Amino acid sequence: MDNITSRPDPTAAFPNPNLPRLCFIKNVVKNPRIIIGDYTYYDDVDGADQFEKHVTHFYDFIGDKLIIGKFCAIAKGVEFVMNGANHRMDGVTAYPFYIMGGDWGSAIAPVKDELPLKGDTVVGNDVWIGQNVTVMPGVHIGDGAIIGANSVVASDIPPYAVAAGNPCRVIRKRFDDDFIDYLLAIKWWDWDIEKIEANFEALSSGDLSLIRKIKV
């Protein structure tokens, strides 16, 4: 596109004043362990700025992070379940007596190293996550992946896969392996915004030959 005179401000909470249901997540979250790339948005008619409430069981003493790349589209109701949701499972019961307080507060509480922690949850760049998806602790979703609505993502999803279901499984690849490798190499999401704007057609049309014509 030529002669662009206005573009969404990557530092704005709500980049389109006519679309208050959509926010750039990076500019509304407060927790420093939620790390979001530029232009990644959350779409929720009931309060897009409430994204952080959908990151659950996110406790400081565990220290895990939620990391989401650039240019991701996250639909209403997506929930990221973090490692604090996991109970110790090597005893007879997984019931956490100690959290009830009172005299039960002296029951054996697990230390961090005894919990089944899965590490940081990482979503790549250019990922589309459909409505009401649940992402479980420690999952890695690759660049360019698409996750179908109402899925429960409990294991890693490779780049440029279309995945859905409970548990979420890969349905198909979006492109052949050679083209996926090419896209992962050029990392279009890291281009400067002027270059992205100049190549909207190559990025968004169904003509995959156009992207290979761009000097990278």
Locations of the language-model features?
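Beta-rich strand-turn-strand
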Residues: 121, 132-145, 151-154
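C-terminal segments of enzyme domains that contribute to small-molecule binding surfaces
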Residues: 2-7, 13, 98, 105-135, ...
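Outer-envelope exported proteins of Gram-negative bacteria
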Residues: 39, 69-71, 144, 148-150
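Short clusters of hydrophobic/aromatic residues that line enzyme substrate/ligand-binding pockets
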Residues: 29, 92, 208-211
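Extended, small-residue-rich solenoid/repeat segments and analogous flexible loops
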Residues: 1-33, 97
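Flexible, glycine/small-residue-enriched loop-and-beta-strand segment within the central core
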Residues: 24, 34, 41-135
